[in-house]
Amino acid sequence: MDEVDDQYTPADVETAIETYWDDTNAYEATKEAHADDPSFFFVDGPPYTSGQMHLGTAWNKTLKDAIIRYKRMTGHHVTDRPGYDMHGLPIEVKVEEELGFETKRDIEEYGMESFIEECKRFAVDNRKAMDEDFQSIGVWMDWDNPYETLSPEYMEAAWWAFQQVDDRGLVERGKRSVSYCPRCQTAIAANEVEYDEITSPSIYVRFPLSNKEGSLVIWTTTPWTIPANTFVAVDKDLTYQAVRAEQGDDSEVLYIAESCVEDVLKQGRYDDYTVVEEYSGDELTGWEYDHPLADQVQTYADFAGAGEVYTAEYVEADRTGLVHSAPGHGQEDFARGQELDLETFVPVDGRGEFTEAAGQYTGTFVRDANDEIINDLDEEGVLLSSGTHEHRYGHCWRCDTDIIFLATDQWFITVTDIKDELLDNINDSEWYPQWARDNRFRDFVADAPDWNVSRQRYWGIPLPIWESVDDADTGDNSTSDDWIVIGTREELAERADQDVNPAEIDLHRPAVDPLTITENGSRYERVPDVFDVWIDSSVASWGTIDYPGETDAYDELWPADFIVEAHDQTRGWFWSQLGMGTAATGQVPYEEVMMHGFANDENGRKMSKSRGNIVTPEEAIDRAGRDPLRAYLLSHDQQGVDLSFEWDGLGEMQSTLNIFWNVFRFPLPYMDLDGYDPATADLSEGSMNIVDEWVLSRLQSVKATTRAAWEEYEIDTAVNTILEFITDDVSRFYIKAIRERMWADEDSASKRGAYATLSTVLDETIRLLAPIAPYLTEQMYQHLNGSETTVHALSYPSVDPEWQNETLESEMAVLRDVEEAAANARQQGGRKLRWPVPRVIVEAEDDSIADAVESLSGLLADRVNTEAIETVTQFDELIERAQPEMSVIGPEFGADAQRVMDAIEGGSREILTEGVTIDGVQYEITDEMITFDAEPPAYISAADFDGGTVYVDTSLTESIEAEGYARDVIRRIQQMRKELALDVDTEIQTAVDVADDRVADLVAQQRDVVATETRTNAFVDNIDRASENGQALIEEWDVEGVTVTIGVAPLKAQLSDQS
């Protein structure tokens, strides 16, 4: 066998294996090995090609890769095409930053076509960089054939889906109030709005009544919306009061909700008030008021129905109980305005600037106008109070600009018309965790508004809508509700007025913009908008298999078997797929969904540049390695729970994998020496003992637990079960138990049994861990076996019932508890494990514990290093010592109580019959005056375990001392062999000089044992001459307070025994 490094160095392993995979086409070999297996249709949630891999995307891709590897190893032909979201604002904003653009006007001046080409270049270049990022953490996907949302085949998938939606009558065009980014100058979806705490103006304003004394009082944090005010809303069931508010010699009548009067008047700093009259909200309906900025906004909403009071459901008994309503902005205001059949007054354009309809504010950006509007309200005498308000407010998900609400013409998928169908379809998918589906996701879907699918941008999939703009015969230029939705490139070629080659047409703007369609006497032009970028990824389940262009894969695979993303996708990709899948096909496009959390810092805070707490995957890999990072990320709860990244945790994972490396290394020199090939391990050969049978049974339990965990996507359970088996069962228990069998010189059935067992355990554990730590397991597999191109082409281990033995596992669990308790008792008694003890007594609480100890007494004696194991139901060597009960003795003996207690302290049970005598006075002692503590004698140490108590006899005999000192000397000699880097089979000569004559005699009694354990060929007496030999090593040691000088040299460089 090739040499294996003493230490696990992830970088060395990973570099070597990366080269090996490339040289052997290991990925292709793995796919080929499972080409005829049942299909598993995995769909990759496409990340935007707008940045580098961060810790969250590293976790996401590692999780996907692990699941794909597991599915392959369990007999599946996995669709593993990676995806990239390459359109939309995420790309546009990055390109604008590169070009130094600040507005759409900059893009128009630069040229739309040139800008789109820059977006395409940026997306493609970043995609290539992200390919490298993901491959750098060992992700095996079809990197030569990713699905890209900018490809004509994929764009066609979106067109086809939208056509299906239109055929169902679910496409609608109309003016609605939408979230709008004034910098990007486009509508954005409600689920794209991100929220932060901001400080806004807080003003209370009087709206003077037209036909009555007094004013309605409203409160708002958006003074800029007051020019668009159309009506005031009240709650029909609330009680409102007309109060005469007094301030000095002045007074005025204000109309406020009863519950808000005190707070509002405090804001206005009024001295006192009286209630003039009370009204219900219903009674206020129809009251008219004067626009507070009528002089500044001459063309304010002055049409029929404007400037009146109406009831509305969105009014609450908060602030003033009256709501200033501007249907041109607020979404609830717009909806109520539509119900009231009011015109929609919108004095703001797509740049977020006031139009000429806003009078003196024309050309001002809306938020920049806040101060001017507040001043004007004050000068008009209608500003009751002005301050600031801290609250959460939305901003654009890509450029961070605060959004505005603007009523604009948009295109919608009316998902509200199929809400019941959507909610029913949710039940057709299984979610991990299930609560994410039944609570978070269902609630989001239930409240989802109609989907605004149009964006007033450039880099995206163009809306495939051609709208009728005139009548070919009459030249009528009025628009209508007549439009055509094109579903494929072939259809476009057939229906367009211009020549279109479907195989070559670029479906992006501006190529499709000039195309027209003339049918039935009408001329149709394409709507200039592009799709909401969430439409792109919503069709991934068929776009990734090139449907509708290719139908075979769709017929065989669709819907997706499995998708996985973070919990923010409940309102993102999980929703968009459900929405489009249901609207276009009537089905949910996925069968299983896994939702993981976010990767945060060690304190659970979001990682960000401003906090300076970002941990990059590259940084983690440089410190610990790819496999340790993968295993660390996957060892935490994967279902809906955020990860708090800790460097210590990553370091511990590297240490854990190093333990596995040491387990892997341990038998190699012995096997090499004996010519044993682990690839040919056969459990039917050799002789098994109880620990072999136990570790093989534990292996079956681990396989069962691990497989069950994978099937429920409890990846952390799988990872931790495997690693705990490696560290606790194999390394700390089994390896220690078989060390002497491996060390033995002669061939034996027992040694062959140990070889076969450990080879089997290693082979199957390597395969169990392969999806988690692909580099390390590949290195181990190729060293131990290598019969296949790659470990990842092998089958995942299955449970072998022949080796299952639950009784043995239970008994061994008891043994290990007893062993741990014995170690604790030794520590209390100051006796190291290397030193034997005369006996260990197990006081068992029940028969099952006693039976287990007796069944495994031989092994247990060896593990706890004792000459004898005794099992008892009650340990009868405890010494009882009396403890006085002061609460009883004090009242009974008064002034003599303390002397009585001193006499009782530490006494025996005879006190109860004989009493105590003090200065010739006899005192009778009763049961209630004493409690008894049972303590072991000085030479016994004790420790409890779940099934009883372990007592360790730490008394010393000459033979025990001799063996103890010998074991200490053996450990030092073995350490020196390591320092000399000697092979396992290298024989040595040894010199041992003990400063204490008595201890020297004890060690001499064990000389044969020392020789056998250390492969000492001969002992020599003259240690002083050893320093003359350059290959010899001489060291001085402190062994239990005695100075022991040891010289060690390989036979080729013998120590001199001549004087």
From Swiss-Prot:
Gene designation: ileS
CDD domains: Anticodon_Ia_Ile_ABEc, IleRS_core
Chain residues that bind ATP: 609
Motif annotated as 'KMSKS' region, chain positions: 606-610
A GO term for molecular function: tRNA binding
Organism of origin: Haloquadratum walsbyi (strain DSM 16790 / HBSQ001)
Listed name of the protein: Isoleucine--tRNA ligase
Entry domain remark: IleRS has two distinct active sites: one for aminoacylation and one for editing. The misactivated valine is translocated from the active site to the editing site, which sterically excludes the correctly activated isoleucine. The single editing site contains two valyl binding pockets, one specific for each substrate (Val-AMP or Val-tRNA(Ile)).
Short motif 'HIGH' region, span: 47-57
